A protein has these predicted regions:
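C-terminal lobe and pocket-closing loops
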Residues: 121, 207-275, 304-307
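An extracytoplasmic/periplasmic, membrane-proximal ligand-sensing/linker region
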Residues: 27-29, 171-175, 260-321
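Twin-arginine (Tat) signal peptide motif
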Residues: 1-23
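Hinge/capping helix and adjacent helix->loop/strand transition within the periplasmic-binding protein
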Residues: 80-86, 100-187, 236, 249-282
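Beta->alpha turn/N-cap motifs
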Residues: 90-95, 155, 185, 202-207, ...
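N-terminal (or domain-start) structured segment
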Residues: 22-111, 150, 158, 174-201, ...
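Stable alpha-helical elements in mature extracytoplasmic
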Residues: 41-45, 49, 53, 70, ...
């Protein structure tokens, strides 16, 4: 009897010790894919709120850059991921632009994604190298018109918003320029810094750090009104092109089929993060205009933007070379 009791106690002690030795349940990890490289609006926005969102979720949110092909590499990855809320994309208007510009994609930009959280809109800064000797947008237009096909502009990649912003302006101004696609906004701005290209339409985040820097000249802003972080840069509309406006949205999407309860949970956590003063300050510095809306309202915005970007692509004549 005593032997059996000692054996039982020994086994129980071993079992309890084993249970205590087991690691705690792994924290949930959410991948937030950014389909562009450092310097892009999407990358800066993702890093502005993801840590706080993670705290509200009780999870880890890892920002993962998957740049290339106008954002389609990252979008394809997310479209093919399980619809469980663990893989999201920080997308923007380039998500729809690519859908209208690429002849064939292995995913549907509309049907394969569901809106989670709207994060804002942003304009672009038409920037040139001072070596050109052009001080105003009018100077730039005059010079580019005198040399059709001789001026080049860099972008964050084929089908990116930086591509279409410049293409849309070229169409409005009657300019013929060659497109030089890069892998990121940072790379595109570097091309201007080195005076290897004549222009870039950069996200505010890509050039605001160069404010006052003699290596760059910021000629115009494509937004509806001047950005508070570059208040001396006039809008394109102010400079002889009334009504011109190019602004891109940024937002968080999930694979289609993600349960609505999961979308609502993710959206609620993001909204709580965006309501924090520290996050609002970071977002404001990115030049984004933000207003809280529901996932349903965001989905309606996505449908409208799909049509808008299709028209912009058509009017601009932009295409994938």
């Amino acid at each position: 009897m005593r032997l059996r009791r000692r054996l039982f106690l020994s086994l129980a002690a071993g079992l309890i010790g084993g249970l205590l030795a087991l690691p705690a349940q792994a924290q949930r990890v959410i991948r937030l894919v950014v389909p562009f490289g450092p310097g892009a609006v999407q990358d800066a926005v993702a890093r502005a709120f993801s840590n706080e969102m993670a705290q509200f979720l009780g999870a880890s949110v890892v920002v993962e850059n998957r740049a290339g092909a106008g954002g389609t590499i990252g979008a394809s990855l997310v479209a093919k991921s399980p619809a469980d809320g663990n893989t999201l994309i920080l997308a923007g208007s380039s998500h729809h632009i690519a859908g209208h510009m690429y002849k064939s994609l292995n995913y549907d930009p509309q049907k394969d994604f569901a809106g989670v959280t709207f994060l804002g809109t942003a304009g672009y800064v038409i920037t040139v190298p001072p070596a050109l000797g052009l001080n105003t947008l009018a100077d730039f237009v005059r010079e580019a018109k005198s040399k059709p096909g001789k001026f080049n502009f860099a972008s964050a990649g084929n089908g990116s918003a930086t591509h279409l912003a410049m293409a849309a302006f070229n169409a409005r101004a009657g300019l013929e320029m060659q497109h030089i696609p890069m892998k990121s906004t940072g790379d595109a701005v570097n091309e201007v810094l080195a005076a290897r290209v004549q222009a870039v339409a950069s996200a505010t985040t890509g050039v605001v750090g160069f404010k006052g820097d003699p290596r760059l000249r910021m000629l115009a802003f494509t937004g509806a009104r001047r950005t508070q972080y570059l208040p001396d840069v006039p809008t394109v509309a102010e400079l002889g092109f009334p009504g011109f406006q190019f602004e891109a949205w940024v937002g968080m999407l999930a694979p289609a089929g993600t349960p609505r309860a999961e979308i609502d949970r993710l959206s609620a956590a993001a909204q709580k993060a965006l309501a924090l003063p520290a996050v609002q300050e970071r977002m404001a510095k990115l030049g984004t205009e933000y207003a809280p809306i529901s996932p349903d309202q965001f989905q309606a915005l996505l449908h409208a933007d799909w049509e808008t970007m299709g028209n912009v692509v058509k009017v601009s004549g932009a295409k994938i070379e």
